[in-house]
């Protein structure tokens, strides 16, 4: 495609206090002055100087062709702040032609978005898109094989002790997030659009919302910790009304620059269906945490 190395138009983004409150609500997170870690995804999506629809057109695809977010990673170099200006720069890092038994031929396109505040790096968001090269709607059935579970490690899970109760995906919050993301994809808003594309019979939850649920789980397991890295693979669709459950394990602890860091493997499931997310989170523990 000749896109690898292509630099995207730069731009800027800002999260106003009221938008920060709305984003916390859309991400099933208690409101607070510090933005949710996955707000970096939102700032990158809104701040890059090209719309999401035009980005997919650059890839030779339309929204209705079923482009999907397959993977996403967020690296936070410093805590995000509301009411702050962020410069956003982006580049297409790689393009790979692949084939799946489920969606046929597709292009795996990796884009990196760098956020700067006051000229200093603030966050890096790397998104991997699956762009189907079959007729419209084929890409919507994207799934990947889940990884193996690992036992015998410190266990994390969603539920009352980790996330304040069961998470049920709310279509109203999906609409709020569509506005905050400037995401025009109708499958997040309209069940008829999802059916028309052969996706599902209900609206489809946005990838960053599913990522935020995973982030909430690990943050609840370590009160007062700060999430500095979240790497996820989105394995299946989460639909409006779904109940989402999660779990994970602590796989490593280290002292870096005088701070204790915990690395966790995480996953999310929709009961009765396949696993929908697997990933890894790194948290910096508060100095008073003696676990």
Question: Regions from the language model: what does each represent?
Answer:
Residues 108, 191-195, 232:
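Residue-level signal for alpha-helical context at structural boundaries
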Residues 64-79, 226-236:
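Small beta-barrel nucleic-acid-binding modules, principally OB-folds
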Residues 21-31, 44, 89, 109-112, ...:
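Generic signature of intrinsically disordered, low-complexity segments enriched in small/polar residues
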Residues 202, 209-253, 271:
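Catalytic-pocket segment enriched in acidic/His residues
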Residues 1-71, 136-226, 290-291:
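Hot-dog-fold acyl-thioester-processing enzymes
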């Amino acid at each position: 495609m000749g896109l690898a190395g292509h630099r995207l138009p730069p731009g800027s983004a800002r999260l106003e206090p009221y938008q920060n409150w709305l984003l916390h609500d859309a991400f099933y997170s208690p409101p607070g002055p510090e933005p949710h870690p996955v707000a970096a995804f939102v700032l990158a999506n809104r701040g890059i100087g090209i719309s999401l629809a035009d980005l997919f057109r650059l890839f030779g695809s339309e929204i209705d062709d079923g482009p999907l977010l397959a993977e996403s990673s967020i690296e936070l170099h410093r805590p995000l702040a509301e009411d702050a200006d962020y410069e956003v720069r982006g580049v297409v890092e790689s393009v790979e032609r692949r084939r799946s038994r489920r969606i046929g031929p597709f292009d795996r396109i990796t884009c990196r978005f760098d956020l700067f505040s006051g000229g200093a790096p603030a966050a890096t968001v790397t998104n991997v898109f699956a762009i189907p090269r079959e007729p419209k709607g084929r890409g919507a059935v994207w799934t990947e094989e889940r990884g193996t579970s690992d036992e015998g490690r410190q266990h994390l899970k969603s539920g009352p002790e980790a996330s304040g109760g069961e998470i049920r995906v709310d279509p109203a919050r999906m609409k709020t997030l569509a506005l905050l993301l400037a995401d025009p994809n109708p499958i997040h808003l309209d069940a008829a659009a999802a059916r028309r594309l052969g996706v599902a019979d209900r609206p489809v939850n946005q990838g960053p919302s599913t990522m935020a649920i995973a982030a909430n789980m690990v943050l609840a397991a370590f009160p007062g910790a700060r999430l500095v890295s979240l790497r996820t693979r989105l394995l299946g669709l989460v639909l409006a009304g779904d109940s989402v459950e999660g779990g994970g394990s602590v796989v490593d602890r280290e002292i870096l620059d005088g701070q204790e860091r915990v690395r966790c493997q995480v996953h999310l499931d929709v009961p009765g269906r396949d696993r929908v997310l697997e990933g890894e989170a790194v948290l910096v523990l508060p100095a008073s945490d003696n676990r």
